[in-house]
Amino acid sequence: MCIRDSPFATEDYNIKELAADVAGIITALDEESAVIVGHDWGAPVVWHTALLYPEKIDAVVGLSVLYGGRSENKPERPVRQDPEDEFFYISYFQDPGVAEAEFDADPEALIARLYASRSPGTPVHPPEITDARAIAGGWIKRLGEPVHLPAWLSERDLKYYVSEFRKSGFEGGINYYRNGALNWELTPELDGSKIQQPALFIAGELDIVNRGATQDELELRAQPHFEDLRGVVLQPGIGHRNQQQAPEDTNRLLIEFLGSLN
């Protein structure tokens, strides 16, 4: 049985609630402001916290996911896939209870396979499910089981992650994926807004999130949305989880950025 102290309502995971949580943590720590860092889905959270709570945020760093501004058009709400359509994990997440049940039943398999699939150079066995159609099954068996864990992931760390997810379950995290359209509806005031604070973006060169974009391409994408972007850094040979695959380099970049602040 999962033990959780996070909200159950899907809409409680919208971007405004999450940004308010970050601002609330700063207040709870009895600090006036802070520099914040977020990776993957944490990056949109810190970007939006900087926009929505400028008085609380001195500077901001995003890893993997670059801020691209508020879209002109409302995102379509993903719908459950037709069973004959090609499997897509975000669509799989839209049907409440389905993905959670699969992941909660075997968190170790999910985490080990997912981390290996995002770690260049880690060998994996062929996936059990090779049929691309949604009807063929869920996500875990579409990911190859790693021959061994990625070099940056120890058995001890994996066991810790698994034990924590056994307590919390995956529903909260998956609910994040169910709020794309609501996030847009809740943030009309951000139309055309730029992040004013000093900012840094770091990504692995091989991170699939950025689809092979070069540093110049990422800088061009970022330019309209930042007032003081102090760097776009691609870490050579690194994949999605750059803070774990390249901790020393990531820490160096963060320390240099902090040193550049007034």
Task: Enumerate the language-model features and the residues they cover.
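Short, small-residue-biased leader/transition segments that mark boundaries at the very start
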Residues: 1-3
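Catalytic active-site module of serine/aspartate enzymes centered on a nucleophile-bearing elbow/loop
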Residues: 227-262
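Flexible "cap/lid" subdomain of the alpha/beta-hydrolase fold that forms the substrate-access gate
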Residues: 5-37, 41-233
